Amino acid sequence: QERRAMGFVGMR
């Protein structure tokens, strides 16, 4: 997913 590429995975 693009979210993981942007680093949103760290916000979760």
From Swiss-Prot:
Got a GO cellular component term for this one? extracellular region
Chain positions with Arginine amide modification: 12
Q: Which GO terms describe its biological process?
A: neuropeptide signaling pathway
The domain of life for this entry's organism is Eukaryota
Which residues pair up as cystines? none
Keywords in UniProt for this one?
Answer: Amidation, Neuropeptide, Pyrrolidone carboxylic acid, Secreted
The subcellular localization recorded is:
Secreted
Which segments does the entry list as coiled coil?
Answer: none
List residues modified as Pyrrolidone carboxylic acid. 1
The record describes the protein's role as: Myoactive peptide. Increases the amplitude and frequency of spontaneous contractions and tonus of hindgut muscle.
Recorded protein name is Tachykinin-related peptide 8
Tell me what organism the protein belongs to.
Rhodnius prolixus (Triatomid bug)
